[in-house]
Amino acid sequence: MIYEKILLKVLLGPHISEKSSTLSGNFSTVIIKVSICATKLEIKRAVQNMFNVAVKNVNTLVVQGKCKRKKSRITCSSNWKKAYVTLKRGQNINFIGSSE
């Protein structure tokens, strides 16, 4: 029970972009924003439990936050982590939902 609550905090949401839609259509890979301290194994288990799909591979990377200057102040956004989750053949996750 406690472990399932931890897995729910791992996934933050989908990363929607042109590249992510191309990857999901051609290579059955989805891009998900995850917690900065999440490991590949935790991400794999969280996706399998939440979406009931078989995961083939998980690749992660940390996106560095950008610093922007407004007048005399410099503000920096925080770093965040995204995961490229490759699903096994025939599996699909549809975040947007289709009307078909």
From Swiss-Prot:
GO cellular component: ribonucleoprotein complex; ribosome
The UniProt record lists the keyword DNA-binding: no
Disulphide bonds in the chain: none
Top-level taxon in the UniProt lineage: Bacteria
Name this polypeptide is given: Large ribosomal subunit protein uL23
Gene that this polypeptide is encoded by: rplW
A Pfam family it matches: Ribosomal_L23
Family note: Belongs to the universal ribosomal protein uL23 family.
SUPFAM superfamilies cross-referenced by the UniProt entry: Ribosomal proteins S24e, L23 and L15e
Lineage, uppermost ranks: Bacteria, Pseudomonadati, Pseudomonadota, Gammaproteobacteria, Enterobacterales
InterPro entries: Nucleotide-bd_a/b_plait_sf, Ribosomal_uL23-like, Ribosomal_uL23/eL15/eS24_sf, Ribosomal_uL23_CS
Gene3D superfamilies: 3.30.70.330
A Gene Ontology BP annotation from the UniProt entry: translation
Organism: Buchnera aphidicola subsp. Baizongia pistaciae (strain Bp)
HAMAP family according to UniProt: Ribosomal_uL23_B
Subunit field text: Part of the 50S ribosomal subunit. Contacts protein L29, and trigger factor when it is bound to the ribosome.
Alphabetic keyword roster: Ribonucleoprotein, Ribosomal protein, RNA-binding, rRNA-binding
Gene Ontology molecular function: any one: rRNA binding
Functional note: One of the early assembly proteins it binds 23S rRNA. One of the proteins that surrounds the polypeptide exit tunnel on the outside of the ribosome. Forms the main docking site for trigger factor binding to the ribosome.
PANTHER family named among the record's database cross-references: 60S RIBOSOMAL PROTEIN L23A
